[in-house]
Amino acid sequence: MQLLVSPSSIDEARHSLAADIIDVKKPSEGSLGANYPWVIREVKAFSDKPVSAAIGDFDYKPGGAALTAYGAACAGADYIKIGLTFEGKEKARAVISAVVKAVKDEFPEKFVVIAAYSDHQRMGSISPFDMAPVAADEGADFVMVDTGIKDRQSTFAFMNEDTLRTFTRTNTKLGLKTALAGAFTFEDIDALKRINPEIIGVRGMVCGGDRNATVREDLIKTALAMIR
């Protein structure tokens, strides 16, 4: 299980180098808010760790999603991550297919991560269980669960441990890897280890409990020690 940490600035990224994966995003623009391409480039330049880039919480806009994904890949991101804020498997298929093609045609070595939301019912968006088979069909590498509305409620408030374990095992059978995120705390780590996704994504946990505070290197090291 790898630890992905989401700094919100270049300065924070410099304090996140202990993480397994550095995730460039802009929390002020949403759960998977996109940061600037020059931030991705600079983080990639000084880090020897894989870099992930969130490209946004997308409504049904396949063209916009494809172009944004391509931009993140060109800027140097190793993982390109998009959230789907709409309902419907066929609409999801169109967006996922476009994003995978935009990235993989030129950068087959890069990873495409498709996110749905644990709180999809209140978001009015596609369920993670409905999204995952579509992502597998269209050639994505990872599927992810995160909270869409950031009100300090955890993914565990919407999907319990058994549900997340089933999700992770189902993804493995589909040939997908799993990333889990969504207001996790240090107290959640034992459950996450039992679920055993490939990646857990955190921000608030390593900011002292407030995702709008600053990433702390000491808390990243604490989290790493706990998940190993």
Give residue spans per PLM region.
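Extreme N-terminal starter segment of soluble prokaryotic enzymes
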Residues: 1-3
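Catalytic cores of alpha/beta
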Residues: 8-18, 53-75, 122-134, 180, ...
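Glycine-rich, positively charged N-terminal anion/phosphate-binding segment
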Residues: 10, 30-46
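Hydrophobic secondary-structure block in the mid-to-C-terminal portion of proteins
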Residues: 150-211, 217
